[in-house]
């Protein structure tokens, strides 16, 4: 089961832009709890605490128990907005979670054994094409990461969604077999491969070309005794 974090909030008696600005001036972030067939509940959260939660990472995949007027509300953040200049939170939305609820979330990918991949050892670079996978899972069992083992990838090879083992109960939303990771060759690698192939082909052709004169010489040698015999007569 995913770890549930605690978060304190205060009910907002008023909504609207003016009330939201007043909350921000008081050092609080306006927000709302909605969903689970219940009316929306305007709230406010202390700005320093919310900022700390956001900066800690994985905010949008963390389940919270919000304490509000003596009651706890099981929620998950669905969106937040930051000030475009000062980069502090100015609004937050929470989705209320009912018992046994499932949810769609985006789970980050964590790479395993990237340093031992054959393609990396030959000078390639790991390119994480997709940083997170959209999945559906139980709200109480959201994985922190989806692990992708790239330890066997050769140069120019890729790891796809079908190559990754998802945790039990986690279903991908994508229908196509997406490319998650590729090993990108270093600059000039394609030319080196072509040059090596050309050299190998030339090396194979050289003995065949050298065999023709030998056959001709053998034929000439076969005629020599006949000519010599005529002279002896």
From Swiss-Prot:
The keyword Ribosomal protein applies. Keywords: Ribonucleoprotein, Ribosomal protein, RNA-binding, rRNA-binding. GO terms for cellular component: cytosolic large ribosomal subunit. It comes from the Bacteria. GO terms for biological process: translation. Coiled coil: none annotated. Disulfide bonds: none annotated. One of its GO terms (molecular function) is 5S rRNA binding. Gene3D superfamilies: Ribosomal protein L25, beta domain (2.170.120.20), Ribosomal Protein L25, Chain P (2.40.240.10). CDD domains: Ribosomal_L25_TL5_CTC (cd00495). Residues 1-23 are annotated as: Disordered. Belongs to the bacterial ribosomal protein bL25 family. CTC subfamily. Part of the 50S ribosomal subunit; part of the 5S rRNA/L5/L18/L25 subcomplex. Contacts the 5S rRNA. Binds to the 5S rRNA independently of L5 and L18. This is one of the proteins that binds to the 5S RNA in the ribosome where it forms part of the central protuberance. This is Large ribosomal subunit protein bL25. It comes from Nitrobacter hamburgensis (strain DSM 10229 / NCIMB 13809 / X14). The lineage of its organism: Bacteria, Pseudomonadati, Pseudomonadota, Alphaproteobacteria, Hyphomicrobiales. The gene is rplY.
């Amino acid at each position: 089961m995913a770890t549930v974090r605690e978060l304190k909030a205060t009910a907002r008696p008023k909504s609207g832009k003016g009330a939201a600005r007043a909350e921000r001036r008081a050092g609080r972030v306006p927000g709302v709890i909605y969903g689970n067939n219940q009316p929306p509940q305007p709230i406010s959260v202390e700005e320093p605490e919310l900022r700390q939660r956001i900066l800690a990472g994985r905010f949008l995949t963390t389940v919270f128990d919000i304490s509000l007027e003596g009651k706890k509300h099981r929620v998950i953040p669905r969106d937040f907005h930051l000030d475009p200049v000062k980069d502090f939170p100015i609004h937050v939305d929470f989705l209320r979670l009912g018992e046994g609820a499932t949810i769609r979330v985006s789970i980050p990918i964590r790479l395993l054994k990237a340093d031992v991949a054959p393609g990396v050892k030959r000078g390639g670079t790991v390119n994480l094409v997709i940083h997170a996978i959209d999945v559906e899972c139980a709200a109480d069992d959201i994985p922190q990461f989806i692990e992708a083992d790239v330890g066997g990838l050769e140069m120019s090879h890729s790891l796809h969604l079908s190559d990754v083992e998802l945790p039990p109960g986690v279903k991908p939303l994508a229908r196509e077999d997406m490319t998650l990771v590729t090993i990108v060759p270093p600059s000039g690698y394609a030319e080196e491969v072509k040059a090596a192939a050309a050299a190998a082909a030339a090396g194979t052709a050289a003995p065949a070309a050298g065999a023709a004169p030998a056959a001709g010489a053998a034929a000439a040698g076969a005629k020599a005794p006949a000519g010599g015999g005529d002279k002896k007569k």
